[in-house]
Amino acid sequence: MEQFHGTTIVSVRRGDKVALGGDGQVTLGNIVMKGGAKKVRRIYNGKVLVGFAGGTADAFSLLDRFEAKLEKHQGNLTRAAVELAKDWRTDRMLRRLEAMLITADATTTLVITGNGDVLDPEGGICAIGSGGAYAQAAATALAHNTELSPREIVEKSLEIAGDMCIYTNHNRVIETIE
């Protein structure tokens, strides 16, 4: 069976504000299965934002594990991310999961990959998924050349990615921490 895939998740941090947004399209092969999926969420009592790209079931499995790590480490985002990445890399079953996460709290944004990488994005901007490169390029240009808020930059970046990537639509969910 083909894997569910294709999405765009983008995060922008500017000053003491961060926004994380994603589109709503779920694709199975060349068929759009759902247009209004919610791939960006608030967890840990609303203090942490998380967005996911990749296999839907894989992403939900990782999201559950990440939430457990956050609880275990009292909301320490970096520690929870590193512990999840360690498990992801060493556990035989977890290694087969195909997904990526972007996580953000009031002070930190991290990208967590299936290779066991935990990346702190340069310049406070990162994006993942099939439309990630388009969204990241747009967000970087907007951040460098405008005074738009992180939420506005995320919204416009997702709009541009949705215009260019066939696996990304214009149904957006955007969460912020200010």
UniProtKB/Swiss-Prot annotation:
The keyword Protease applies. One of its GO terms (biological process) is proteolysis involved in protein catabolic process. The keyword Metal-binding applies. Its EC number is 3.4.25.2. GO terms for cellular component: HslUV protease complex; proteasome core complex. Na(+) binds at G162, C165, T168. GO terms for molecular function: metal ion binding; threonine-type endopeptidase activity. Keywords: Allosteric enzyme, Cytoplasm, Hydrolase, Metal-binding, Protease, Sodium, Threonine protease. It catalyses: ATP-dependent cleavage of peptide bonds with broad specificity. Gene3D superfamilies: Glutamine Phosphoribosylpyrophosphate, subunit 1, domain 1. Protease subunit of a proteasome-like degradation complex believed to be a general protein degrading machinery. NCBIfam families: ATP_dep_HslV (TIGR03692), PRK05456.1 (NF003964). A double ring-shaped homohexamer of HslV is capped on each side by a ring-shaped HslU homohexamer. The assembly of the HslU/HslV complex is dependent on binding of ATP. This is ATP-dependent protease subunit HslV. The gene is hslV.
